[in-house]
Each structure stands twice: as C-alpha cells, then as structure tokens.
Swiss-Prot record:
GO MF terms, alphabetically ordered: structural molecule activity
Subunit structure: GvpF to GvpM interact with each other in vitro, and may form multi-subunit complex(es). Might interact with GvpA1.
Motif (Conserved in GvpJ1/2 but not GvpA): 44-48
Regions that span the bilayer: none
Start and end residues of each stretch annotated as Interacts with GvpL1: 1-25
Family: Belongs to the gas vesicle GvpA family.
Function: Proteins GvpF to GvpM might be involved in nucleating gas vesicle formation. A minor component of the gas vesicle. Gas vesicles are hollow, gas filled proteinaceous nanostructures found in several microbial planktonic microorganisms. They allow positioning of halobacteria at the optimal depth for growth in the poorly aerated, shallow brine pools of their habitat. Expression of a 9.5 kb p-vac DNA fragment containing 2 divergently transcribed regions (gvpD-gvpE-gvpF-gvpG-gvpH-gvpI-gvpJ-gvpK-gvpL-gvpM and gvpA-gvpC-gvpN-gvpO) allows H.volcanii to produce gas vesicles. All site-directed mutagenesis is tested in H.volcanii. A minimal gas vesicle can be made in H.volcanii by gvpA1-gvpO1 plus gvpF1-gvpG1-gvpJ1-gvpK1-gvpL1-gvpM1; lack of enough GvpJ1 prevents formation. A similar region restores gas vesicle production in H.halobium without the p-vac locus, but it still has the c-vac locus.
Alphabetical keyword list: Gas vesicle, Plasmid
Superkingdom of the organism of origin: Archaea
One Pfam family of this chain: Gas_vesicle
Locations listed in the record: Gas vesicle
Protein name (database record): Gas vesicle protein M1
Swiss-Prot/TrEMBL induction comment: Probably part of a gvpF1-gvpG1-gvpH1-gvpI1-gvpJ1-gvpK1-gvpL1-gvpM1 operon, maximally expressed in early to mid log phase. Gas vesicles appear earlier when grown in static culture, possibly due to O(2)-limitation.
Amino acid sequence: MEPTKDETHAIVEFVDVLLRDGAVIQADVIVTVADIPLIGISLRAAIAGMTTMTEYGLFEEWDAAHRQQSEAFTTSPTADRRED
C-alpha cells in the first residue's frame, strides 16, 4: 500500500499560506481597437491577512481606528444592555 495525499484540503492550505505570507498581483492592460490603444489600466493588489498587512505598513491607521472603535463599543455601558 502506498501513501496518498488527501487533496480535499489543498484550498485550506492555500488560504492559510495566502493569509500568512500574502501575495501581490500586478497587471497592466491596454485595450486596443484596430491597433489604436484606447484604454490603459494599471492594477496592483495586495492580498494578505491583517497581521501581515500591518507588518508591512499597510492599513496601520485603518486597523488602529477600527480596533479603538471596537474597544469603545464593547466597553460602553449600552453594549451590555439587551432589548426585551
């Protein structure tokens, strides 16, 4: 009997690596008609977990503001009150 690898968890491993290490996608697209360039698009996207993003200096202010807002909401006296 030979060992086999379960392929059903490959997507989970991929997402784990993507969130932990991150990825940068860059694309340049030029739309032409009859060899005449009409539209130029330059795209750049960074995909990663928030921990990785803040380690690289991305979304630091956004993360800090949302953490502060969340902390203020959870410690407010109205957060513990339930509606009947």
